């Protein structure tokens, strides 16, 4: 032996990895016994050195990292920058959170890296450093929290808390930081998400499923096996689950011979040792191994299918309870890993992406056509390359080539100068980590008005849900303000109040018998004030400078429409006026869009709800006179008449008709299935057949229509037994009016219908009196539409007439299905279109479309009749209400207040802002929303525009702005009005230039403005409006209202359509409180002669430069511009990326706490055990995690068609079902194993296979081929079903099923085990009623009754083996010369003797002297 002094001395620090390598080399070189001795000496040496050193921790040993201060300040600075970008709308909430997480995580990791070098340089013998590095106490992560910073914390759900803990445990935590720390680490009462009891309950359920599984035999002789490829091959083949690692092969038993070329290296039923596994790893052929999944019986398991015992590294012994071991091995890791306090205390850890940095300075060049723009996960602009991108970096020295991998993000542009070590790209990870889509709602915690800068998609994400998705990145603004409720007597406008033009709601009135006539009012003393468009037409005074009067489209008067989700028709409201009463009423008429109308054809129909019925019956005409009409003339454009096959009859003279109620049912069931007889009397809700229940009581009348069809009529009413039968029978089947008498003692007060009938048994005639419904058609309903008295007499007007139609013939039966009302009478409208136009059209077709006007980013929609060649695009709209009042001239007219609850909640309204001026001569621009703009979705892409179209037609004006005097006739240029009101010429010149610049800007963007809803492009966008003002106030397109004059004026604005027709739209104000709660004043002169950076209505963000060095200190919208300051309505801006789901539309009101938008984003799935345990439970309980797609049925049918070709066997469905179940078992095992492996816990696959085998060991008896063996839906053991199919001539049908742990525990063969688990009373009662027998095969039921458990030495197999050994010893001791024959030896070893008196298929154990209750018959 060498002298100790001659041995080499290694003075090196040995960490855990080096110690593992040392122990491995010792085992290989010296064996296990010598290695154990050496390690004991190392242990003794370590304790001696530690005792001599006497290392302990003190408060002075906890020294902080010197660089900690500036690293934390740098992270806080990055947080301030992200917060500023978030307020400006450059980032949304998710991107801000990601930036914060990345910044603080990078700071924390930098501190962790700096900690070890700091200790080595400053104090290498620091006890904290030595203990953490050696692993004696704590880890690097724990020391980092003690001396560096606590960092980011993760909540119990795995989500990162965005508020980092800047301090460490040495300095101490604040109250807020302590709460966050406890919430992440789940200490004490904060631990409410995951408890140890959850893991304990999981273990209990697992044990309940497999507690009866034990090793009973040596070999079950199954031909089945599992095929795997070794992990060294690195490939996956069709038909195999995947690869098998080296550790997975050790302890298994081969199911087939393994050959190396032609030499057999392993045989069947040979267990795989470590050396054999190493040899098999080099094989490229699939390896077939035995598995608990392939064992024949589900009540026990054999030695070869189980393999090695993990404790002894040898084949498992007979009688070992492997089921309980499997359940505990799966549930125990969850119990140990539930509390993260023992590890890192909930500290968040993540991975920083891999970046590509430039090696030296130079210019970057690459092909930009191979890139497409995108955003990084932090909100920075980037470009993604679809394929590998070649990149060239050049400088004065030379050019270097580089290749950027595909799907990488580039942070630079071509031709950009980059510096050394600058990040130019972010490389995508090679292995995609598991992600989950999360939808985060955004709560702005502010109130105000919503404004969208872009439009959204309307998509259908499910059958009954229509979602709105943002089609591209855009901003959403919340402009400050709050609505206010006025009482009905308040009508004064306040400063900064919002003025709204909205129709008054119309309540549904039952009585609609008023006539339609021309209102008796004089135009000289009444002013007609309406909500909506009042006058559209071509008046000669508006076209004095036109060389040729244009042919126009025209818009129907008194029509207000709203966008809705209807498919074809829109609703139109027409005026009705009650006679002798100055009150207007309206009726709803359906109009078909995207359709044409010929001359004198029906344009629309009105369905009065008074002439609707929800009761089936028979129509009987009374005094009404009708006239048949040609059905071809009734091709209703509104979409109502052309869908009905019933003939219509025109009403010529007023009168009445009746509906005799009755219920009619047609059944094809046999007479034996009808539960009532003819002429029987039933109550409401009586059962007629198995599928028919009466809705009302009455008399049953049945009639056989054919061999298999019977008509059942239920006639409601009263049965009368008359004394004078002859007189009554003469008056049968008649209608009796009120006042008539049936007999001396019965007088009729309402209309009734008499029907006599005879009872066969009594032979007597009775009378059924049925109350009927009367419908009156008065002359008012036949009146014509009133003429428009407010139009000039010289102007041509459209003539319209109304026709009433009855939709049923006399004696026709009306059938109501599903309580859907049936219309009996319709009022139709016919308009003579040709007489309304100013010139003859080349064709006699008119098309209906919508004009949608975008007013202040909101929409108003009107019905338009287009004499166009092709029909316009179809749009769905819904009607809003119209209201009109007549006010005498000379009296102030209070504005209508928005108090009523409109039935159309999403009505779109024109709005304006009221501003009061203190000085009459003050010039002030204020935002007024009477400007129209085109929807981007239907934008005309042609360059150029006609922003000054209207101005050119009006006296050659160029800038399109007008100032109207009080006479409302003189039109002058805005520049003249400005020069009259401004005393300072410099200011005047600046204002004129600013206004002209704004006008030119509108002309350059003409494709974005104009009318919306017509097929042809819009050519003009300038929409002036005029106001009647007093004093010297200025009125422009962005005008204001001065209420100093107590005078009621009318306001108009003009539209121009695609045919250059000028349309006059008089409107009125509708008041609601303004939204400027806290306006922001900018005391800066933002105008100059050179440039004006802001304009009315401009949305400005925080810190935006307005003029030179002056910035806006708060976001908002410019509402007014003064020569010395501007008025900004404060607001907040939020960024919404593509795919976001907005919950509010533009113009809606947002209250505090409302959800603004929902942002989707991808998040890495947490690998924490707290999220893994619910995942394991979800898998083992067989819960559905996602809905099945709608097309799965078609895919399954295609798969069934090709399954025969794939398998090539007429039993393909049976084989396919078995193969699918095997694949399902392997997937379950793989998913559960991955959850535990994510936490570093490895569970033996054999234990998982035992659990999964029990979950899939049962089948469900199906209804096809029902026999007397099993009931449909009954759970049956798979082996039992297979045995019965081998015995029966007619096989039973069953389907495979995957049971959950709980259901499998309650579906065993032992009712004692089920009752001891849960639902004790129900299980025992059910077992008693069925007379179930418990054969006491499992461990639990034997423990319950106090008997010995059938495992270990109590196992029958072990007991039999002991008896055989005793018998052998006794025979050898007695010295018997007779030797056992081979047959007797085999019989003795098996423990059975053959009896001639019994059936040879039964073998009774003779050696066991036990009671009959413990007799074990091996029948499986």
Curated annotation (Swiss-Prot):
Cofactor note: Binds 1 Zn(2+) ion per subunit.
CDD domains given in the database record: RNAP_beta'_C (cd02655)
Positions contributing to Zn(2+) binding: 220, 295, 302, 305
Alphabetically ordered keywords of this record: Chloroplast, DNA-directed RNA polymerase, Metal-binding, Nucleotidyltransferase, Plastid, Transcription, Transferase, Zinc
Documented EC number(s): 2.7.7.6
GO cellular component: chloroplast; DNA-directed RNA polymerase complex; mitochondrion
Keyword Ubl conjugation in record: no
Summary of the function given for this chain in its UniProt record: DNA-dependent RNA polymerase catalyzes the transcription of DNA into RNA using the four ribonucleoside triphosphates as substrates.
Name of the protein: DNA-directed RNA polymerase subunit beta''
Organism: Adiantum capillus-veneris (Maidenhair fern)
């Amino acid at each position: 032996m060498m002298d100790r002094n001659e041995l080499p001395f290694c003075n090196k620090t040995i960490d855990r990895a080096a110690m593992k390598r040392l122990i491995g080399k010792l085992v290989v070189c010296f064996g296990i016994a010598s290695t154990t001795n050496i390690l004991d000496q190392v242990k003794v040496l370590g304790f001696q050195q530690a005792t001599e050193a006497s290392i302990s921790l003190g408060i002075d040993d906890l020294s902080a990292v010197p660089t900690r201060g500036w690293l934390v300040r740098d992270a806080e600075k990055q947080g301030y920058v992200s917060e500023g970008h978030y307020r400006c709308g450059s980032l949304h909430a998710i991107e801000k959170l990601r930036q914060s997480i990345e910044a603080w995580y990078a700071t924390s990791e930098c501190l962790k890296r700096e900690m070890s070098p700091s200790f080595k340089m400053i104090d290498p013998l620091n006890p904290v450093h030595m203990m953490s590095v050696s692993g004696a106490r704590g880890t690097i992560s724990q020391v980092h929290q003690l001396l560096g910073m606590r960092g980011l914390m993760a909540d119990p759900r795995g989500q990162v808390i965005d508020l980092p803990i800047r301090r460490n445990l040495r300095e101490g935590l604040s109250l807020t930081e302590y709460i966050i720390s406890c919430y992440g680490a789940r200490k004490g009462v904060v631990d409410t998400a995951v408890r140890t009891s959850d893991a304990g309950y999981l273990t209990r359920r697992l044990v309940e499923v497999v507690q009866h599984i034990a090793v009973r035999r040596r070999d079950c002789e199954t031909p089945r096996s599992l095929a795997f490829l070794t992990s060294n091959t690195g490939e996956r083949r069709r038909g195999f689950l995947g690869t098998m690692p080296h550790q997975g092969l050790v302890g298994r038993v081969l199911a087939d011979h393994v050959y190396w070329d032609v030499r057999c290296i392993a045989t069947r039923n040979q267990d795989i040792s470590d050396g054999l596994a190493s040899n098999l790893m080099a094989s490229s052929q699939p390896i077939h191994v035995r598995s608990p999944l392939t064992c024949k019986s589900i009540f026990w398991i054999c030695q070869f299918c189980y393999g090695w015992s993990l404790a002894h590294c040898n084949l498992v012994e007979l009688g070992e309870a492997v089921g309980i071991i499997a359940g505990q091995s799966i549930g125990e890791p969850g119990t140990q890993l539930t509390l993260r306090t023992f590890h890192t205390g909930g500290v968040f850890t993540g991975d920083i992406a891999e970046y590509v940095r430039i090696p030296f300075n130079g210019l970057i060049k690459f092909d930009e056509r191979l890139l497409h723009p995108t955003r990084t996960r932090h909100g920075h602009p980037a470009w993604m390359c679809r394929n590998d991108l070649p990149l060239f970096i050049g400088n004065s020295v030379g050019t270097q080539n580089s290749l950027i991998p595909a799907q990488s993000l580039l942070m630079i542009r071509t031709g950009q100068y980059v510096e050394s070590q600058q990040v130019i790209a972010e490389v995508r990870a090679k292995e995609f980590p598991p992600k989950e889509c999360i939808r985060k709602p955004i709560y702005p915690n502010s109130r105000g008005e919503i404004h969208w800068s872009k439009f959204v998609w309307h998509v259908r994400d499910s059958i009954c849900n229509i979602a709105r998705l943002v089609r591209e990145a855009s901003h959403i603004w919340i402009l400050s303000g709050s609505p206010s409720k006025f009482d009905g007597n308040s009508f004064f406008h306040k400063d900064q109040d919002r003025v709204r033009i909205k129709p008054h709601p119309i309540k549904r009135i039952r009585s609609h018998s008023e006539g339609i006539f021309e209102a008796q009012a004089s135009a000289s003393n009444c002013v007609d004030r309406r909500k909506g468009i009042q006058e559209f037409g071509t008046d000669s005074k508006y076209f004095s400078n036109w060389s040729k009067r244009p042919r126009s489209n025209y818009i129907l008067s008194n029509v207000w429409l709203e966008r809705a989700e209807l498919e074809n028709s829109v609703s139109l409201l027409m005026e009705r006026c009650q006679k002798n009463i100055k009150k207007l009423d309206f009726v709803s008429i359906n109009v078909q869009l995207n359709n044409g109308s010929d001359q004198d054809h029906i344009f629309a129909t009105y369905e009065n709800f008074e002439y609707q019925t929800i009761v089936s019956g028979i129509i009987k005409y009374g005094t009404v006179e009708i006239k048949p009409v040609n059905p071809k003339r009734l091709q209703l454009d509104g979409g109502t008449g052309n869908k009905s096959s019933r003939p219509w009859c025109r009403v010529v003279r007023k009168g009445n008709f009746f509906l005799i109620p009755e219920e009619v049912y047609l059944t094809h069931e046999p007479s034996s299935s009808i539960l009532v007889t003819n002429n029987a009397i039933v109550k409401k809700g009586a059962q007629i057949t198995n599928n028919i229940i009466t809705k009302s009581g009455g008399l049953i009348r049945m009639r056989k229509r054919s061999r298999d069809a019977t008509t059942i009529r239920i006639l409601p009413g009263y049965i009368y037994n008359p004394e004078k039968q002859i007189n009554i029978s003469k008056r049968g089947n008649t209608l009796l009016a009120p006042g008539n008498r049936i007999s001396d003692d019965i007088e009729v007060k309402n209309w009734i219908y008499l029907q006599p009938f005879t009872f066969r048994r009594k032979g007597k005639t009775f009378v059924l009196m049925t109350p009927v419904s009367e419908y009156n058609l008065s002359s008012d309903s036949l009146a014509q539409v009133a003429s428009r008295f407010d139009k000039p007499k010289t102007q041509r007007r459209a003539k319209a007439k109304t026709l009433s139609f009855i939709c049923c013939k006399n004696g026709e039966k009306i059938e109501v299905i599903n309580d859907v009302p049936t219309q009996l009478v319709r009022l139709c409208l016919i308009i003579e279109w040709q007489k309304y136009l100013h010139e003859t059209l080349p064709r006699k077709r008119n098309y209906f479309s919508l004009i949608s006007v975008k007013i202040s980013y909101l929409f108003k929609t009107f019905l338009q009749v287009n004499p166009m060649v092709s029909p316009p695009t179809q749009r769905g709209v819904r009607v809003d209400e119209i209201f009109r009042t007549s006010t005498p001239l000379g009296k102030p007219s209070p504005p209508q207040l928005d108090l009523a609850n409109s039935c159309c909640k999403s009505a779109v309204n024109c709005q304006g802002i009221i501003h009061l001026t203190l000085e009459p001569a003050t010039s002030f621009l204020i935002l007024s929303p009477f400007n129209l703009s085109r929807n981007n979705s239907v934008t005309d892409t042609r360059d150029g525009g006609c922003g000054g179209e209207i101005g050119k037609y009006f006296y050659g004006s160029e800038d399109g702005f007008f100032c109207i005097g009080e006479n409302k006739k003189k039109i002058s240029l805005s520049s003249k009005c400005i020069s009259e009101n401004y005393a300072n010429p410099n200011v005047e010149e600046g204002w004129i230039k600013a206004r002209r610049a704004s006008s030119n800007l509108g002309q350059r963007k003409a494709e974005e403005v104009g009318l919306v809803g017509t097929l042809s492009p819009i050519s003009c966008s300038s929409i002036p409006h005029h106001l009647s003002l007093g004093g010297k106030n200025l009125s422009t397109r962005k005008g204001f209202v001065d209420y100093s004059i107590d005078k009621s004026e009318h306001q108009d604005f003009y539209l121009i359509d695609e045919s250059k027709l000028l349309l006059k739209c008089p409107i009125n104000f509708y008041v609601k409180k303004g939204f400027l709660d806290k306006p922001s004043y900018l005391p800066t002169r933002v105008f100059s002669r050179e440039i004006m950076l802001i304009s009315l209505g401009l949305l400005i963000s925080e810190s935006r430069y307005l003029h030179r060095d002056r910035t806006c200190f708060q976001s908002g919208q410019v509402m007014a511009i003064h020569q010395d300051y501007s008025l900004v309505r404060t607001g907040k801006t939020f960024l919404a990326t593509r795919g976001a789901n907005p919950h509010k539309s533009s113009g809606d009101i947002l209250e505090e706490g409302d959800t603004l938008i929902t942002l989707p984003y991808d998040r890495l799935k947490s690998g924490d055990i707290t999220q893994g345990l619910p995942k394991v439970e979800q898998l083992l309980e067989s819960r559905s995690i996602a809905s099945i797609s709608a097309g799965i049925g078609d895919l399954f049918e295609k798969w069934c068609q090709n399954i025969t070709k794939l398998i090539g066997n007429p039993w393909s469905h049976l084989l396919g079902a078995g193969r699918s179940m095997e694949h399902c078992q392997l997937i379950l095992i793989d998913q559960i194993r991955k959850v535990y492996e994510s936490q570093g816990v490895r569970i033996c696959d054999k234990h998982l296979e035992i659990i999964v085998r029990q979950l899939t060991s049962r089948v469900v008896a199906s209804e096809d081929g029902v026999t007397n063996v099993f009931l449909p839906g009954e759970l049956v053991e798979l082996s039992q079903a297979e045995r019965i199919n081998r015995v029966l001539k007619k096989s039973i049908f069953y389907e495979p099923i995957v049971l959950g742990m709980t259901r499998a525990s309650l579906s065993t063969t032992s009712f004692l085990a089920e009752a001891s688990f849960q639902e004790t009373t129900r299980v025992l009662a059910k077992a008693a009623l069925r007379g179930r027998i418990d054969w006491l095969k499992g461990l639990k039921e034997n423990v319950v009754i106090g008997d010995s458990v059938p495992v270990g030495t109590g196992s029958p197999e072990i007991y039999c083996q002991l008896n055989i050994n005793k018998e052998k010893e006794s025979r050898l001791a007695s010295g018997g010369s007779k030797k056992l024959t081979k047959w007797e030896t085999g019989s003795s070893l098996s423990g059975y003797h053959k009896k001639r008196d019994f059936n040879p298929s039964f073998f009774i154990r003779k050696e066991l002297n036990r009671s009959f209750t413990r007799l074990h018959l091996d029948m499986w």
